[in-house]
């Protein structure tokens, strides 16, 4: 029987405004954001906190004080927060990190893997040591985090895991220097899909966010947002089509919306995937890319 007594089709399918708002709320949830010191990681942590979650944050660099500043911003919202140093490529560090968060928060409802390491060398010129460093953080680290946190979520029969992949993980790059990044990000995309299969029966959703161009703290996106198709003016030599396609300066010209994404726009996607608003979404690579992959 589809309807309960006194219910009609209209009042079943039309939620109230309060119900819609509550679906996006993270009030009472406990989140762990990995790689939250700056840029997108910081934005994700603050976004989850604004939606109501208590947020633990971690980074390999804690000495600069930036991570503690993010934690202070979260606490200023009347949320709980702790800032912890961890090398997620090290299994012992990951175990200690998760244990500390659970001791402080009681559980982990949301895991966001955002940590990233770049290397300027082309994939064809990369040496074995550099490749190992890249994969240890960008791939092994994500795997270690999921392996350590998922048993907690299995025990409580709920959870949301969100990985950061990229447009680079979804199509090959003309720019050789992006090759190693693309290979690793494609691995994260498949890791997301595989864990969706394994953890779905335990009511744990596993998704990924795939941005295209996103503002940096050094290059804010607000002006770009207001002025479509405007780029930084500076002298430059004539570029090839491949360089034009991949360049930070001209890249927005190849995005239908004509601009880079702001941190707030990225955070909105994270809140959606972490919340009950996406309760039937798992195994998805969410392109937050201004139409780049269209």
Where are the language model's segments positioned?
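Short C-terminal tail/terminal secondary-structure segment
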Residues: 3-22, 259, 270-271, 282-294
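Canonical Rossmann dinucleotide-binding motif of NAD(H)/NADP(H)-dependent dehydrogenases/reductases
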Residues: 24-56
């Amino acid at each position: 029987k589809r309807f309960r007594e006194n219910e009609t089709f209209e009042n079943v399918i039309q939620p109230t405004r309060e119900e819609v708002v509550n679906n996006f709320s993270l009030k009472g949830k406990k989140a762990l954001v990995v790689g939250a010191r700056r840029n997108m990681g910081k934005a994700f942590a603050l976004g989850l906190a604004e939606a109501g979650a208590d947020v633990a944050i971690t980074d390999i660099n804690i000495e600069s004080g930036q991570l503690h500043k993010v934690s202070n911003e979260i606490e200023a919202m009347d949320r709980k927060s702790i800032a912890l140093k961890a090398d997620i490529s090290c299994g012992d560090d990951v175990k200690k990190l998760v244990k500390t968060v659970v001791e402080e928060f009681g559980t982990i409802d949301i895991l966001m893997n955002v940590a990233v390491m770049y290397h300027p060398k082309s994939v064809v010129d990369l040496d074995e040591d550099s490749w190992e460093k890249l994969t240890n953080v960008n791939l092994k680290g994500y795997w270690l985090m999921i392996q350590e946190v998922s048993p907690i979520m299995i025990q409580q029969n709920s959870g949301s895991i969100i990985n950061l992949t990229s447009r680079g993980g979804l199509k090959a790059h003309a720019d050789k220097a992006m090759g190693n990044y693309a290979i690793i990000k494609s691995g994260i995309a498949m890791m997301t899909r595989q864990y969706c299969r394994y953890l779905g029966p335990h009511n744990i959703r596993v998704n990924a966010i795939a941005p295209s161009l996103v503002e940096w703290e050094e290059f804010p996106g607000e002006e770009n947002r207001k002025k479509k198709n405007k780029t930084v003016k500076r002298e430059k030599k004539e570029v090839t089509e491949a360089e034009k396609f991949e360049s930070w300066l001209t890249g927005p010209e190849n995005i239908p919306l004509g601009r880079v994404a702001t941190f707030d726009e990225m955070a909105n996607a994270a809140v959606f995937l972490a919340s009950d608003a996406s309760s039937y979404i798992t195994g998805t690579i969410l392109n937050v890319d201004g139409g780049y992959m269209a």
